[in-house]
């Protein structure tokens, strides 16, 4: 039996079966990268996916360009500066290039479109950034329903075009600055206690600020009767919760999971807290009969920096999600990739608790392992790519190469 990626949660025999199916069909898997935006990202102190609210407006576009074009090309949009580290899109790009996989980028209404080939949904599905979750009216219900249906249609179409062996596996990745906060809001609205255990791109997750925004959003939504005031006691309407507190990525991704449960498509949810919220939404929307099937088909794949972060607890969060909807523990894996040793300082920042995850980095690093490649080799390849992207490290005081005409260091992040 081949070695498994590090299993965080789930039965070992289910994990082995899931990994075996992925190894067999890995070259044919589809990688879907969902870009979305929420005005929640403009709240000061909520995200490190750019050092200012204005810089976070371009994060998704710049990360998608790095993902597609690679580190040796001048990017059309400079990567926004980070407090520390380098964009997780760098890790994802190295994996995709090494495994010969080509991502499909979908723009769900970002303020800045990526200057690479991508799909951009028209309104209402792609109607710009979601409003701040504190308004309790993040998206119109018609938009949420359109995104859910679009996800279902894509999933069903993929199944119809699949070979006789069944639908090819799907990797779902995201880039949504502010998305861990909308994740916490949606989880709370669905009745999952998530305060203090949701991660984020900041060195220390802004738990108090997240909790305040979530409380304000729930109160505003209850005042509009979008989410029942007793949501923790009565089963809430998941579509209403999404409309009140969520972001476009969550809706489209949940629709894809609904189709996967119907068609039998295996899905790797490449991320941490944000993908946990997507899984919770799909479970809430499914009939009780289909929930165990989805739990067997879908797995969370994240980085070790999220999995073992002292200020969050993804495993506990997933246990609560499973218990809430009466399923066995959801499958969850952590990549073995670490950036210890003589690597670029921007990568070593991950070991200090910065950036941690985004743009599918953890899940794609797990694919690397399933392909039989070593995490040490991946770390070396990321080091080489980082030198290509931002140049060799400078002697103290730290300095960074600057994109011509931008004044911004070539860095970016997510969440």
Locate each region found by the language model.
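N-terminal loops that bind phosphate or other acidic moieties
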Residues: 1-173, 177-415
């Amino acid at each position: 039996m081949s070695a498994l990626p590090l299993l965080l949660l789930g039965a070992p025999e289910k994990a082995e079966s899931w990994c075996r199916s992925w190894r067999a069909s890995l070259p044919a898997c589809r990688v879907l990268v969902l870009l979305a935006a929420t005005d929640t990202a403009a709240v000061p102190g909520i995200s490190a996916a750019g050092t200012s609210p204005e810089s976070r407006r371009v994060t998704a576009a710049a990360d998608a360009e790095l993902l597609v074009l690679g580190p040796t090309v001048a990017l059309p949009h400079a990567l926004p500066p980070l407090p520390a580290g380098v964009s997780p899109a760098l890790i994802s790009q190295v994996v995709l290039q090494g495994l010969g996989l080509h991502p499909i980028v979908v723009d769900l209404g970002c303020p800045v479109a990526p200057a690479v080939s991508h799909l951009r949904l028209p309104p209402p599905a792609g109607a710009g950034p979601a409003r701040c979750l504190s308004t309790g009216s993040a998206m119109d219900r018609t938009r949420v329903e359109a995104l859910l249906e679009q996800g279902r249609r894509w999933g069903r179409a993929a199944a119809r075009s699949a070979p006789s062996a069944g639908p090819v596996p799907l990797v779902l990745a995201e880039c949504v600055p502010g998305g861990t906060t909308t994740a916490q809001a949606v989880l709370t609205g669905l009745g999952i206690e998530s305060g203090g255990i949701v991660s984020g791109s900041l060195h220390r997750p802004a738990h108090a600020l997240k909790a305040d925004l979530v409380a304000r959003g729930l109160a505003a939504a209850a005042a509009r009767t979008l989410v029942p005031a007793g949501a923790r006691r009565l089963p809430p309407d998941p579509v209403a919760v999404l409309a009140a507190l969520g972001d476009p990525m969550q809706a489209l991704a949940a629709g894809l999971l609904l189709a996967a449960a119907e068609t039998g498509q295996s899905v790797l949810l490449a991320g941490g807290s944000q993908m946990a919220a997507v899984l919770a939404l799909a479970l809430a929307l499914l009939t009780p009969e289909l929930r165990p099937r989805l739990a067997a088909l879908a797995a969370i794949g994240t980085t070790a920096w999220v999995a073992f972060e002292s200020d969050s607890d993804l495993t506990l969060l997933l246990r609560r999600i499973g218990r809430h909807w009466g399923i066995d523990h959801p499958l969850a894996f952590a990549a073995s990739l670490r950036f210890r040793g003589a690597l670029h300082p921007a990568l070593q920042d991950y070991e200090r608790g910065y950036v941690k995850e985004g743009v599918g980095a953890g899940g794609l690093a797990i694919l690397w392992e399933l392909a039989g490649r070593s995490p040490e080799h991946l770390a070396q390849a990321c080091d080489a790519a980082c030198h290509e992207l931002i140049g060799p490290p400078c002697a103290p005081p730290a300095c960074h190469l600057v994109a011509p005409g931008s004044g911004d260091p070539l860095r970016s992040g997510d969440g």
